[in-house]
Amino acid sequence: MINLLNITYPEFESLIVTTLQEKTYRAMQIWQWVWQKQITDIESMTNLPQKIRASLTALIKINLPEIVTIQQSSDGTKKFLLRLSDGALIETVLIPSIDKAGNIRITQCLSSQVGCSMGCTFCSTATMGFIRNLTAGEIVSQVLLAKLHLNDNKPDKPIIRNIVFMGMGEPLLNLTELTRALHILHSEKGLNFSARRITVSTCGIKKGIQALSENGLAFLALSLHASNQELRSTIMPKAAKWDLKELIDTLKNYSLKKREKITFEYLLLGGINDSPEHAKELAKLITDIKGKLNLIPYNPAQGQPYLKPTEENILKFQKVLWSKGIVTILRKSKGQDINAACGQLKTTYLSQSSSTIY
């Protein structure tokens, strides 16, 4: 059987027309039942004749992960621990904000891998090691589950407004499945996320950056975290195999849409990369790129050797960047009290469980 969540709309339409010998509008009806109304029970798709429902039941399945736990932070952030069909565990996070009209808007942080191979020394996920890539269906199912949880079924007034690939894993090391997932997210007949509402964050995988530049399916964020190659080699040893200056040159040739900017992410580690000298070096590195910089104070995590920077050092760092003409945003981390903030995603459930899933 075919997992409907794992295929794009053109593939699904072809399946309905060629295999079931039905009209294309039937494909659209089914697709909208799943992706807009979050109906995953085929028998509940009431505008389909019984014959089609029976044929569809024999042809496709809709595999959703199991929700193991949901934790809610004092700031409203929610972290979902999900169990996939093979028992693997991943996390996805819902981050709330309030728009100008006073409505709640959610940014969802998605995982792209089980674990991560990059080994960044400040990241809790890195301690899991790399287990496997997620399929496109496993990526987009995180969104479907979140929409079900939120009762987010009004396409003209969505609650989940933005998607960020900043969860577990390096998205651009899972480029094939990531690209398929982006096409599913984009489908105007379904979730209808435009490129400007999706951000893919990477440690700096050049091949993947070039692919994202060509396909234009999402905005780009670069996890920089260091102002020079030597420092990056220390705190991001595997990512540092891509020379920093070559990486910046790649970004200078990145194809940007109108009003699009590259986002640079810089995690401030107390006493490591947070001096005014680092700020000057950083400004020089990125000054020729159309972008903006997110400053992220480090969130202390169990077992990690780093400290949170002082408020004084944070402000000094930001002041230097502003003086050099770098648009700099001090990002407030949410979900710290449930280990859902930047760098804290890790399936701690494993260590709390007496059973082993592998």
UniProtKB/Swiss-Prot annotation:
Cofactor(s) this protein cannot do without: [4Fe-4S] cluster
Any single GO CC term annotated in Swiss-Prot or TrEMBL for this entry: cytoplasm
Intrachain S-S bonds: C109-C342
Classification via InterPro entries: Aldolase_TIM, Methyltransferase_A, RlmN_N, RNA_MTrfase_RlmN, rRNA_lsu_MTrfase_RlmN/Cfr, rSAM
Keywords: 4Fe-4S, Cytoplasm, Disulfide bond, Iron, Iron-sulfur, Metal-binding, Methyltransferase, rRNA processing, S-adenosyl-L-methionine, Transferase, tRNA processing
Reactions that this protein is recorded to catalyse: adenosine(2503) in 23S rRNA + 2 reduced [2Fe-2S]-[ferredoxin] + 2 S-adenosyl-L-methionine = 2-methyladenosine(2503) in 23S rRNA + 5'-deoxyadenosine + L-methionine + 2 oxidized [2Fe-2S]-[ferredoxin] + S-adenosyl-L-homocysteine; adenosine(37) in tRNA + 2 reduced [2Fe-2S]-[ferredoxin] + 2 S-adenosyl-L-methionine = 2-methyladenosine(37) in tRNA + 5'-deoxyadenosine + L-methionine + 2 oxidized [2Fe-2S]-[ferredoxin] + S-adenosyl-L-homocysteine
Superkingdom of this protein's organism: Bacteria
MF annotations from Gene Ontology: 4 iron, 4 sulfur cluster binding; metal ion binding; rRNA (adenine(2503)-C2-)-methyltransferase activity; rRNA binding; tRNA (adenine(37)-C2)-methyltransferase activity; tRNA binding
Domain Radical SAM core: 102-337
Gene Ontology biological-process entries: rRNA base methylation; tRNA methylation
Main subcellular localisation: cytoplasm
Coiled-coil portions: none
Catalytic activity, EC: 2.1.1.192
Chain residues that bind S-adenosyl-L-methionine: G169, E170, S201, S223, L224, H225, N299
CDD domains xref list: Radical_SAM
Subcellular location(s) per record: Cytoplasm
Cofactor note: Binds 1 [4Fe-4S] cluster. The cluster is coordinated with 3 cysteines and an exchangeable S-adenosyl-L-methionine.
PROSITE patterns named among the record's database cross-references: RADICAL_SAM (PS51918)
Binding site for [4Fe-4S] cluster: C116, C120, C123
Record-stated family: Belongs to the radical SAM superfamily. RlmN family.
Function: Specifically methylates position 2 of adenine 2503 in 23S rRNA and position 2 of adenine 37 in tRNAs. m2A2503 modification seems to play a crucial role in the proofreading step occurring at the peptidyl transferase center and thus would serve to optimize ribosomal fidelity.
The protein, known as: Dual-specificity RNA methyltransferase RlmN
Organism listed in the record: Lawsonia intracellularis (strain PHE/MN1-00)
